[in-house]
Design a protein with these regions (language model features):
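Nucleic acid-processing catalytic cores of prokaryotic defense/repair systems
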Residues: 1-141
Length: 141
């Protein structure tokens, strides 16, 4: 059963509060993404994998932080890091992804900021995570 907008907003509020002080990629990224997907009723491990090894364009090995085949490639950085560099790194990983598994979206984040790239439409959407801007009753701020 799909979640209501109200339930998604309530979950998003809890998520934002729970991760308001997260900052370290190594320590906090996996639980962050597990809970992020739960906001939308998605069990991350049922749709994708963490730390997927791929061969980059320069033949060096890279590690995709989270990969949902045909849907999403996630690259995560510690809070305050350059998300443009993260996006370039994510695009470099595409070289090592099988053609029939290439994702529609790339999502980069540093806990506080998200940038979603739609590779098919060649658009990007930016969002800042702020628990104070999300209303648990489902209404818009």
């Amino acid at each position: 059963m799909p979640l209501s907008r109200r339930e998604i907003r309530a979950r998003a509020t809890r998520f934002a509060k729970d991760f308001a002080h997260a900052h370290n990629e190594e320590a906090d990224a996996k639980p962050f993404w597990l809970k992020f997907f739960e906001v939308f009723g998605v069990q991350a491990r049922s749709v994708g994998s963490y730390e997927v090894h791929v061969k980059k364009l320069d033949n060096a090995l890279g590690k995709i932080d989270f990969f949902w085949p045909r849907t999403l490639l996630v690259e995560h950085k510690s809070k305050g890091k350059d998300l443009n560099k993260a996006a370039i790194q994510a695009v470099d990983y595409l070289h090592g992804v099988k053609e029939n598994e290439k994702p529609r979206f790339i999502l980069v984040s540093d806990f506080a900021r998200f940038v979603l790239y739609n590779l098919e439409e060649q658009t990007q959407t930016e969002l800042t995570l702020d628990a104070h801007e999300i209303r648990p009753d489902g209404s818009d701020p």
